[in-house]
Amino acid sequence: MKCRRIWTTIFWLLPLSVAAELLQPEIGLGWTNGWVREWRRDVPGLKVSDCSERVSESLIKVVRRWTWTGTTPLERVTLSVRYRVDGDAKTLKPFIPGVLLYGNPSNKGRTDGRVPVFAGEPGEFAIFEEHRVPMPFALLEDARTGAFAALHVLPSPVRGAKREDLWWSIGVETASGGADIVMLSGPVGYNRRWSVVKALQNAAMPYDETYITLLPGQIVEKTFWIETGTATAEEFGFEQALDVSLALFRPYDAERFEKFGDIVKTKRKFALSRWVEGPVPNACGFDMYDQHYQWRHLTIGWCGCAATCGYALPVLNLDPSDWDKAQRSLDFLCDAFADTVQTDGLFRVTFDMKTGQKTGADFALGEAVGGDAVSCGQGLYSVLKAIRFAERGGKGRLDTSKWRRFAMKVADAVAADILRNDWREPDSTGPGFLVAPLVVASEMFGRPDCLAAAQKLAGTFERKYFGYDAVYWGGTLDASCEDKEGAYAAFQGYLELLRNAVASGNAAAERRYARLARHAMNMMLTYTMVWDATYPPGRLSDHAFKSTGWTVVSAQNQHLDAFGVLTTPEIWRMGEYLGDERLKRLAAVMYRSCFQLTEDRKSAV
């Protein structure tokens, strides 16, 4: 690597698809009213140098080094990296995976701390701890020209911090004549509030005094990569940055996790531990809760597994008794909820085993109304897949008559509702979970209206989300923001439409849905951890937890969850269609990594 003062020449080293430059380093000194007191370019005794290496035509690696040569500690210091992108800040769309997706337009104008937003207005900033960013990069993409610049970073905690477990931060802020991608040695803030973090669901949490102290002779180094490029018809800027992030971190080692076969057997054992019967006559199925919990609920979709097991157990075929449980559970669900199907096809999704009451998804809120599109779509998809397997590979061991009647009733009603002239387009992508089952129903029941409805619904998502003005959102039932579940809804639907197009030989539809499926999948994948964060002393570090393969929930709920496991079959299928082994290897890591933190009792740690 070449080491020199490169901040005045770095933009000459990259293609000029975007007017941008690495700014001269500034050092923050002092701390007043929750932020850096002043910024200086020269601090006597503090040496700053950059070492650079060209990785590819569009990517340069930089290691910035700060060396404190003073004889006494330098206190209340903030180190920084700034990359200036010229242009209109309002059209420079910021993308920080899992945190700020093109500015989180679904919450445009929000000023509280629930969801971060960024519209490029004067004085705006959005800066977050690196450990919250699953694919550690920040990007600015010009919505008019497609030109973009991104900083990829090697995440790290900071030595010499007053606060325990302080990490570097990364984000964006507006500047004169453009916007900056910034990296700071700790300070954070968003929605025009300095020194707050997104650590609570509905509010910002104060996070002050994020400065450091440099000791005599101390050296601090920060590794980052500068990427520039231009969006194309085949790849937006965030998709190109995703490819670079995967190449840099290579999150493909599945062998350090439990074996796939062992995981499947354990999951089956856990599912069977939830099997319940009565006291309501003939009621049986897979409980949403542990046996010791006060409630006995069969719940379809979302966090419930009531319909899923009826499909999965016969496919696995690990024990003859599993087929009987699959038959009985789906028979009961289809009987129990058939009379709750509304004219729009939605139905109640929770059955109380003690009282026989049928409610919506969130029983705790007393939702005695129809279910939501997310849960109903996921539940219908499970029933249809169970029918498809039973009739293709079940060898007559399963009776699908009740399943067919229920699925046909729901699919016909959903399709009729969507095809109405006065149908109201959904605000979010959550109803996208209806697309995939509609495609399957159209083939299974010979219902062209179901396919037409699936195409109409998918078309609304294409118009809204295949661009910069809106991002897939609203798939998480306990949040209202950009989220991976909304992207998954679109991806799953597009993938079924792609399969249908391939099967029918419709080349134009295949090209269209292949691109849309890849876009939605890539947006979904940006929520996936591609690196192993380190953790302070506690149960996560006790178990040497590896975060690679887990997923950030949403812009509002910036914590890790195992939901990404549900997406792995589709990621694998997309990898097969594209001939992309990376996707298949990543899917394997996601599935196997998310088995961590499971005790012998098979309950979450």
Model-derived regions, located:
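Glycan-recognition and catalytic cores of secretory/periplasmic carbohydrate-active enzymes
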Residues: 232-605
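Carbohydrate-recognition beta-sandwich/jelly-roll modules
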Residues: 22-403
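Hydrophobic h-region of N-terminal signal peptides that target proteins for export
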Residues: 11-20
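Short, intrinsically disordered, low-complexity terminal segments
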Residues: 6, 16-17, 504
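Generic secretory/membrane-interface signal
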Residues: 2-3, 15, 136, 300, ...
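Bacterial N-terminal signal peptides that target proteins for export
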Residues: 1-10
